[in-house]
Amino acid sequence: MNGIKVGVLPWGQNVDWPTLRAVGQRADELGYDSLWTWDHLYPIQGDWQRPIFEGYLILAGWAAVTSRATLGLMVGANTFRNPALTAKLVTTLDHMSDGRAILGIGGAWFEREHRAYGIEFGSGFGERLDWLDEAVDLMAQMLRDGQGTARGRFYHATNVRNDPPPVQRRLPILIGGDGEKKTLHTVAKYADAWNTGGDVDFVRHKDEVLRRWCDEVGRDQAEIERTLGMGTVIIRDKESDARSYYAEIQRQHPGFSDQPKIGTAEQLADRLRPYVELGFRHIFFDASAPFDDETLERFVTEVKPRLEAVRAA
């Protein structure tokens, strides 16, 4: 858990499958530690009335053409699937990938896709986080004990079996989110990894809250891997070249306006230094079609070694 790991999250929107498959292969060949994708039914960047692929099937497709990187949703929408089914899905992915699956899960937030697909969205985020807590409890039982029982307010199951078990002795559960009253409590109880993002002060505060929850539930906080999402990254030696590529992203994703992290490999490593010093050792960034091979290659060959040096200092 102590080494630096880097990952990439290729968007499943506004892209064809051969291109999406190829970027997964390329990342794996370059030595990325993890491959992620979204779990959304409508695009979340730019115009929502555009094409997007389903998350678990993207991961299954990558499992067939990769051999190294772990595979997970960043993060799965708990509302989309019965939690017992989610445990079965990620277990199947673990077998398809020879033990490389991660169960990424969160409370879900994009109301438009829920309404369109007729998926229950609850009365608010607080209720969905209550659902998440019950769901992760059941999923953890199934993944770790081979069967699970749920007698909560929202989910009901009696000795539901998960057979075959995962390939991994402990298939990791990653929970994304920052809520101090509910999400981080759930992370402390069940998660093997936690995902967050934001400026250093924000992340430091959330990490402190998580540590307090770990103390309260009797959990060693060091057991929980910290992961950091950077959003879109463009590595170039000249800012004008980076801006030119950003314009290509905007053309392919109309309405996309988020500001990417732009800089040289050294500048990006310097930007990440305080997070590594804080204990975040698994860092990933978003990648959108048209996929940027220069950034993909330089992040793993130039940024990662610099972060390893920070960790070792």
Q: What is the predicted role of each segment?
A:
Residues 1-313:
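Active-site-adjacent structural elements that line small-molecule/cofactor binding pockets in enzymes
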